[in-house]
């Protein structure tokens, strides 16, 4: 059998309670007690439903209600009860006399919950939060593993490019794979070292060293100045030479100079 709603369609008042209604309800309950909230409105002369009268009495009018903020002892008691009961505010209110479930719920959301978060405690399970440093360390380890795996893939690809892809197959044992990868790593490092040495040697001139430039800084400027003058003179000479001039005459001149040089050597 379904329960009939306590509020009728017409004739019931809604909205905030007045002082007159509070006095009627308080005087009736204190005189006759709580017999049943469905019949109290009619007996007390109120145009309210039973649920509205019950909530008004339990949350505002009963004489054992405590006024003012919750004490520190009540706050600790709420935390302990919440750890066992969770968000069952009506059951928590039964263990704290003079406080309503609505008052306890509001105080939890506005004060206790924020306080626990500042202390590093999760208000849902009352356990300390996980340290962010541990999460960062695990992240770094995972990133390192990923980078190592990428390096290994590059090495295997390098082996396949060199034509050694037949050496590594699915049936190859792990020991042989490690040896092949190690040899590839050494070859790869030697190749990189050779490239770096060649690149570094290109920065030095055969007729000019870094030690000389450090010991005599003036020589650096003089040498660069002389080289620039020589280059400019060569450019001017090439531009001034006639393009139709036969180059065979220079070969004959070279032979004559060579013969004269040999004669001088024989005479001496």
From Swiss-Prot:
InterPro entries: Homeodomain-like_sf (IPR009057), Myb_dom (IPR017930), Myb_TF_plants (IPR015495), SANT/Myb (IPR001005). This is Myb-related protein 315. It is found in: Nucleus. Pfam families: Myb_DNA-binding (PF00249). The gene is MYB315. Transcription factor. Keywords: DNA-binding, Nucleus, Repeat, Transcription, Transcription regulation. One of its GO terms (cellular component) is nucleus. Its main location: nucleus. It comes from the Eukaryota. Expressed in roots, stems, leaves, seed pods and flowers. Strongest expression in the stem. Gene3D superfamilies: Homeodomain-like. GO terms for molecular function: DNA binding. Signal peptide: none annotated. SUPFAM superfamilies: Homeodomain-like. Residues 9-61, 62-116 form the HTH myb-type domain. It comes from Antirrhinum majus. Residues 37-61, 89-112 bind DNA. PANTHER family: F14D16.11-RELATED.
């Amino acid at each position: 059998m379904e329960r009939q709603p306590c509020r009728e369609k017409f004739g019931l008042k809604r909205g905030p309670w007045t002082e007159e209604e509070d006095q009627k309800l308080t005087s009736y309950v204190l005189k006759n007690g709580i017999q049943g909230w469905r019949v109290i409105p009619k007996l007390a002369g109120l145009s309210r439903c039973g649920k509205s009268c019950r909530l008004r009495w339990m949350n505002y009018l009963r004489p054992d209600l405590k006024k003012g903020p919750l004490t520190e002892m009540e706050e600790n008691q709420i935390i302990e009860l919440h750890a066992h009961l969770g968000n069952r505010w009506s059951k928590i209110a039964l263990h704290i006399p003079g406080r309503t479930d609505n008052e306890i719920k509001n105080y939890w959301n506005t004060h206790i919950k924020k306080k626990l978060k500042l202390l590093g405690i999760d208000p849902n399970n009352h356990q300390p939060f996980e340290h962010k440093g541990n999460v960062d360390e695990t992240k770094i380890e995972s990133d390192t593993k990923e980078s190592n795996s990428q390096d290994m893939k590059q090495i295997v690809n390098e082996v396949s490019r060199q034509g050694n892809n037949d050496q590594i197959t699915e049936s190859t044992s792990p020991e042989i794979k490690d040896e092949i990868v190690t040899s590839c790593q050494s070859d790869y490092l030697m190749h990189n070292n050779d490239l770096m040495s060649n690149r570094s040697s290109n920065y030095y001139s055969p007729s000019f060293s870094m030690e000389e430039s450090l010991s005599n800084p003036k020589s650096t400027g003089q040498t660069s100045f002389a080289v620039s003058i020589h280059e400019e003179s060569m450019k001017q000479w090439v531009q001034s030479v006639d393009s139709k001039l036969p180059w065979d005459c220079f070969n004959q001149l070279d032979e004559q100079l060579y013969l004269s040089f040999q004669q001088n050597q024989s005479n001496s």
